[in-house]
């Protein structure tokens, strides 16, 4: 088996940490989603995982980047970002665009995810306003993470290895495009349904 197909200890540890956060997100989402429909249970699982990633992984990344950089840091979280940095070197050495986007992501997106969890569980009227806002912010974060790099012919991206290209870059980032897109579609359908219901009610009294 070629070297590009080998899964090292660093990669295994990082993937186990991500899997642990996913398991925690699933457990929290299912617990909070008791009595909810399947779509909302799925949304809660995603939002719990989303919040955990923003606060437990990206929050420490921002701190490490502001006091120094990931390359010169030690610890479990630093090791995870060093591993991801093999696919995208901007996460290892201080990159102003990445750090700026991540500050916004941690502070705004993480907080919005928590507020949205509350809004879904408590069936608040502002649920879809928060959902649309969060999804747009997540998509904007992905856009600003990769478009500047693509415009400069991706000098920091390593696509020569299947793990780095398809798992780290494509899958882990693609999830933050696919699921916010699905949640935007859910909000669109719910707002359309509410508008049709309100319109039909008004017509009955005319």
Swiss-Prot record:
Cysteines engaged in disulfide bonds, as pairs: none
Transmembrane region(s): 10-30, 42-62, 101-121, 165-185
A cellular component annotation (GO) from this entry: endoplasmic reticulum membrane
Membrane topology per record: Multi-pass membrane protein
InterPro entries documented for this protein: EBP (IPR007905), EXPERA (IPR033118)
Keywords: Endoplasmic reticulum, Membrane, Transmembrane, Transmembrane helix
Signal peptide limits: none
Domain EXPERA span(s) in chain numbering: 39-184
Tissues where this protein is expressed: Widely expressed with highest levels in liver, lung and kidney.
An individual GO BP term: sterol metabolic process
Domain of life: Eukaryota
GO molecular function, one term: cholestenol delta-isomerase activity
Record localization: Endoplasmic reticulum membrane
UniProt similarity note: Belongs to the EBP family.
Quaternary structure (record): Homodimer.
Purpose of the protein: Does not possess sterol isomerase activity and does not bind sigma ligands.
Protein's name according to its UniProt entry: Emopamil-binding protein-like
Gene name of this polypeptide: EBPL
